[in-house]
């Protein structure tokens, strides 16, 4: 089954072709992402209307490019998957409209995919994928969640942020220290040059039971430290290091608690913040100490992309799910409300190849 995946939930246009007749890395026949960073840089953040208009301009050319790179004719597609939420409503509607129109024209099924389920399942596209049960840390600019995955499609949210997501805290902290947009990656790179321990900030909500997160207070603490400092380049790097250490420590502590709570020893990490080098290293060290395993997708599949949508959509199409003819999106969507997969990779149920 060859599935076209379309991602347009925010400021990146992603397209991919996933082939269920293959497995591991080769199953992803091709994928491409167009980033709108340059478009939004002068505003210091994503402008929803501009994002939607740019998806309109870029989506069809990107589909043609990706099909060409995959060596797949448009009439060879067996299904179309698209991000149906959560995300910016206008941006979502662009992808959904193109996907539903294409599926109708080709007379193939379409399926709307939950954006965060796509992230969660992304590590399963790699060689030697993790098998449920496992705990997933979904950490991005819009979400920070710990999810218990008992089976594919069966999700229980164990904890989530009560305010800012981790990626959002990175971006906002970078902006208030004068770093260019997008700030999160810039701050992480700067932290590599900072002195560990010169600035030590709180590890929010780690001094009490529970698996929820809160990063707004940490952000304020960093702001006060920055305002009272000499604001030199050296101090900026040291504060960046202190902030990153605080976020990473918090995420690691909560992940270990979640593994204990779920009585599980496999951790999956996905989402844009999953590319952070210090977070990856610390989680790998923690997993080794407890004799467990931590799984990441390749960095290109941590940020928003069409590959994760094609893969998640393929699993749900194979399970018999279909979207109706209406173009419907859900800007706010609880992943725990998703129907379980009746069939899917590593689910113990035989998959029907198309």
Curated annotation (Swiss-Prot):
<dbReference type="InterPro" id="IPR022450">
    <property type="entry name" value="TsaD"/>
</dbReference>
<feature type="binding site">
    <location>
        <position position="304"/>
    </location>
    <ligand>
        <name>Fe cation</name>
    </ligand>
</feature>
<keyword id="KW-0012">Acyltransferase</keyword>
<dbReference type="InterPro" id="IPR043129">
    <property type="entry name" value="ATPase_NBD"/>
</dbReference>
<keyword id="KW-0408">Iron</keyword>
<dbReference type="GO" id="GO:0005506">
    <property type="term" value="F:iron ion binding"/>
</dbReference>
<feature type="binding site">
    <location>
        <position position="184"/>
    </location>
    <ligand>
        <name>substrate</name>
    </ligand>
</feature>
<protein>
    <recommendedName>
        <fullName>tRNA N6-adenosine threonylcarbamoyltransferase</fullName>
        <ecNumber>2.3.1.234</ecNumber>
    </recommendedName>
</protein>
<keyword id="KW-0963">Cytoplasm</keyword>
<dbReference type="GO" id="GO:0005737">
    <property type="term" value="C:cytoplasm"/>
</dbReference>
<feature type="binding site">
    <location>
        <position position="115"/>
    </location>
    <ligand>
        <name>Fe cation</name>
    </ligand>
</feature>
<feature type="binding site">
    <location>
        <position position="171"/>
    </location>
    <ligand>
        <name>substrate</name>
    </ligand>
</feature>
<keyword id="KW-0479">Metal-binding</keyword>
<feature type="binding site">
    <location>
        <begin position="138"/>
        <end position="142"/>
    </location>
    <ligand>
        <name>substrate</name>
    </ligand>
</feature>
<comment type="similarity">
    <text>Belongs to the KAE1 / TsaD family.</text>
</comment>
<dbReference type="GO" id="GO:0002949">
    <property type="term" value="P:tRNA threonylcarbamoyladenosine modification"/>
</dbReference>
<dbReference type="InterPro" id="IPR017861">
    <property type="entry name" value="KAE1/TsaD"/>
</dbReference>
<feature type="binding site">
    <location>
        <position position="119"/>
    </location>
    <ligand>
        <name>Fe cation</name>
    </ligand>
</feature>
<feature type="binding site">
    <location>
        <position position="276"/>
    </location>
    <ligand>
        <name>substrate</name>
    </ligand>
</feature>
<dbReference type="GO" id="GO:0061711">
    <property type="term" value="F:N(6)-L-threonylcarbamoyladenine synthase activity"/>
</dbReference>
<keyword id="KW-0819">tRNA processing</keyword>
<dbReference type="InterPro" id="IPR017860">
    <property type="entry name" value="Peptidase_M22_CS"/>
</dbReference>
<dbReference type="InterPro" id="IPR000905">
    <property type="entry name" value="Gcp-like_dom"/>
</dbReference>
<comment type="function">
    <text>Required for the formation of a threonylcarbamoyl group on adenosine at position 37 (t(6)A37) in tRNAs that read codons beginning with adenine. Is involved in the transfer of the threonylcarbamoyl moiety of threonylcarbamoyl-AMP (TC-AMP) to the N6 group of A37, together with TsaE and TsaB. TsaD likely plays a direct catalytic role in this reaction.</text>
</comment>
<keyword id="KW-0808">Transferase</keyword>
<dbReference type="Pfam" id="PF00814">
    <property type="entry name" value="TsaD"/>
</dbReference>
